[in-house]
Amino acid sequence: MFNLIVSKLFGSRNERFIKKLKPQIDQIAALEPEMEKLTDEQFPQKIAEYKEQVAAGTSLDDILVEVFALVREAGKRSLEMRHYDVQMVGGMVLHSGRIAEMKTGEGKTLVATLPAVLNALSGKGVHLITVNDYLAKRDAEWMGKLYNFLGLTVGVVVHGLSDEERQEAYGCDITYGTNNEFGFDYLRDNMKFYKEQLVQRELNYCIVDEVDSILIDEARTPLIISGASEDATSMYGRVNSMIPLLKRDEDFEVDEKGRSITMTDDGVMKCEQILGIDNLYDSQHISFQHHIMQGIKAHHLFSRDVDYIVKDGQVVIVDEFTGRLMPGRRFSDGLHQALEAKEGVKVESENQTLASITFQNYFRMYNKLAGMTGTADTESVEFAQIYDLEVIVIPTNTAMIRKDFPDSIYKTQQEKYNAIADDIAAKYKKGQPVLVGTVSIEKSELVSSLLKKRKIPHNVLNAKHHQQEAEIVAEAGHKGHVTIATNMAGRGTDIKLGEGVLEIGGLHIIGTERHESRRIDNQLRGRSGRQGDPGSTRFYLALDDDLMRLFGSDRIAGIMDKLGMEEGEPIENGMVTKAIENSQKKVEGHNFEIRKQLLDYDNVMNQQREVIYTLRRDVMYSEDMNEMTAEFVEELFDDAFYAVEEAKGKPLDAETEEMVRVRLDELFGINRNEEFKEALPTREQAEEWVSEILDTLKESAGDHYHEIQRYFLLEALDRNWKEHLLNMDHLREGIGLRGYGQKDPKHEYKREGFELFREMLGRIKENTVRALCHLRIETEVREDEFQHKESKSDLEYSDSENTETKKKPKRRSEPKVGRNDPCPCGSGKKYKKCCGK
């Protein structure tokens, strides 16, 4: 109530924020005559002057007014486009590190040039993220005219570029590209062996176009780089043949909302009978259990032409948010192989994760993050909580006059689609263009077949035909055109009205069902009524639509029966529309919780990832590895001689002495010293001997010694990190069961994950030192001897470690904290720079 009174007296926070910018807008306008007097040659000179000022300490805010005025004039000359005042507001919002909500057709692409130029003056680079390669290339080429006019360089990062081309693109003042390319480049950079191979610079300032699509819709999908594992693929075919024998609700239960499967006791017994095993949950049969669950998911939760298509003998994922094909992307955890077995195509080998990150954690690494979209306000709470981003709604340049008709709700799919076809036919007859939005390829082809029967010409825009996408969208606003499109979210291309269309009502939008997100419905509506044009929208629903079926269509069916409604007669009632919106809010809330859960778990991995990637960078940029190697050796001696130190001068029993000797030989190869075979060396003797080994290696390797140390450390780090990711995946899969033991699964995951991480750091040190102490250089070291091999699986490694089972020597119950390890106090700093000072 208080907020309502304050809003009425002083305007909303949004209105107050925009009002505060008015003086700067006026100052920019006042500079326009001065900027008009500049010659073309003076624009790059002005930019060079501003760069010098920023380098000398001037803040970007201090020169914002002048730079925005300069960019406005540059736009007029290079693009014949002048930034409106509301676009200036959008530019200021983006520069301030917020999200600008701007309606379709308000010129978001042009708005981004203002903060991009201003922030490029720091020399640290600006990244502009788009949803696909086509838009990245289009925007870089289109807006590149403006940047080049100002003397700034512009690059574009798209699929298929070499590392050299990527380095060049990232080295530009302003770089366009997709979220996937930027994220994967970050992961790939953290798998490189030499700093010269890195392609990305510091993550400085980022503007995300269609920010809701990238930071919310795609946030549930982590980016994963994987390599082939050694699991056999034959089991997928075997399990696939038994899935039809299992009955839904009898042998397993399906939760469509949560997209999960639960086996019943009867189902478990049936699987055991079919497979001829005693206990499906026995540790030796655990892989059967995993394959069966994925097989049931493939058959009962994933549909062909909705979640994926089969093309050229391959299962290709369809992006559920944009309807685009995602070639090269695979479902993880064996699900993709289960789908391949279901569809009868070749089953590719399962992959093991080598590196992964979520978009949430990738984009939060930027020093400053901003975004723009036509629809963000409905998700403003999530943007604030997860990304600390405020949403500012930018007023339109001209008033909106589009008509949004109430939803038409029918009892059955057949009635609904007949009504849709009637509506299209009526609009086509008078020449009004129509855009039909569907939620899947299957539905778009159903509408297409109805129109073919009525002999209504039309275009289909979906994941199967997106090569012609730009042409189809460009013509969708022309007189008499009918266009059917899967999810228009993120299409990024405006639909401009053709000649004579304004007079007959503008573009008419038809939604064939409500999406689970209100935002995506709003994006479809927003394709009509751009820049004050007329237009209209209507959604057609049926009680057996997925959203209606999952969230309370029974109540509406009861109302229709009581009203005695005849077949083909729709409900058009505000209360029903409100109930549907409430259902959507429930789904949005449910999805928000899933994303928060993902982030909570990924934050544990993120802290570990930061430590590992920081260590990798330190090693790559280090000019002298001797200090780090010496530190590792000292820590391993502490571990090996722990039992000796605990004995406090007393002689060790024969068994303990033998275990200490075995440990020293595993790590340092001391059995090569004849003297040590007769009596266990003291720590001082062993340290002196290891020091001699490393000195000899240093002398033999000459200038390459630094490279050898770095190679062995990075190789050990990558190998152990890969295994650690697999262990963390297994921990995550089983952690949910801790809830049954009255333990908080997230707390247990964090605690056990940290233990696994500490053990992994110990193994990295062991592997590195062992490799150095067992290395023999018999010939002259060649330049490429220790070059990183592209395929890590090709690396062969051998040492003198005895493979027999041995009793382990007495070791510390708590691992010693290494000087480069994360400090146990939780500060996030290295131990040597925190409590270890």
Swiss-Prot record:
Highest taxon of the lineage: Bacteria
Molecular function (Gene Ontology), one example: metal ion binding
Chief site of localization: membrane
InterPro entries registered for this protein in UniProt: Helicase_ATP-bd, Helicase_C-like, P-loop_NTPase, SEC_C_motif, SecA, SecA_CS, SecA_DEAD, SecA_motor_DEAD
Cofactor note text: May bind 1 zinc ion per subunit.
SMART domains: SecA_DEAD, SecA_PP_bind
GO biological process per UniProt: intracellular protein transmembrane transport; protein import; protein targeting; protein transport by the Sec complex
Membrane topology note: Peripheral membrane protein
Entry binding sites for Zn(2+): C823, C825, C834, C835
Residues annotated for ATP binding in this entry: Q87, G105, E106, G107, K108, T109, D494
Gene Ontology cellular component terms for the protein in this record: cell envelope Sec protein transport complex; cytosol; plasma membrane
Location of the region described as Disordered in the Swiss-Prot/TrEMBL record: 788-837
Cofactor dependence: Zn(2+)
Subcellular location: Cell inner membrane; Cytoplasm
E.C. designation(s): 7.4.2.8
Keywords associated with the record: ATP-binding, Cell inner membrane, Cell membrane, Cytoplasm, Membrane, Metal-binding, Nucleotide-binding, Protein transport, Translocase, Translocation, Transport, Zinc
Reaction catalysed by this enzyme: ATP + H2O + cellular proteinSide 1 = ADP + phosphate + cellular proteinSide 2
Pfam families: P-loop_SecA, SEC-C, SecA_DEAD, SecA_PP_bind, SecA_SW
HAMAP family membership: SecA
Assembly with partners or alone: Monomer and homodimer. Part of the essential Sec protein translocation apparatus which comprises SecA, SecYEG and auxiliary proteins SecDF-YajC and YidC.
Known function: Part of the Sec protein translocase complex. Interacts with the SecYEG preprotein conducting channel. Has a central role in coupling the hydrolysis of ATP to the transfer of proteins into and across the cell membrane, serving as an ATP-driven molecular motor driving the stepwise translocation of polypeptide chains across the membrane.
Annotated PANTHER family: CHLOROPLAST PROTEIN-TRANSPORTING ATPASE, SECA INNER MEMBRANE COMPONENT OF SEC PROTEIN SECRETION SYSTEM
Family statement drawn from the similarity comment of this UniProt entry: Belongs to the SecA family.
Protein name as annotated: Protein translocase subunit SecA
Protein source organism: Maridesulfovibrio salexigens (strain ATCC 14822 / DSM 2638 / NCIMB 8403 / VKM B-1763) (Desulfovibrio salexigens)
Lineage: Bacteria, Pseudomonadati, Thermodesulfobacteriota, Desulfovibrionia, Desulfovibrionales
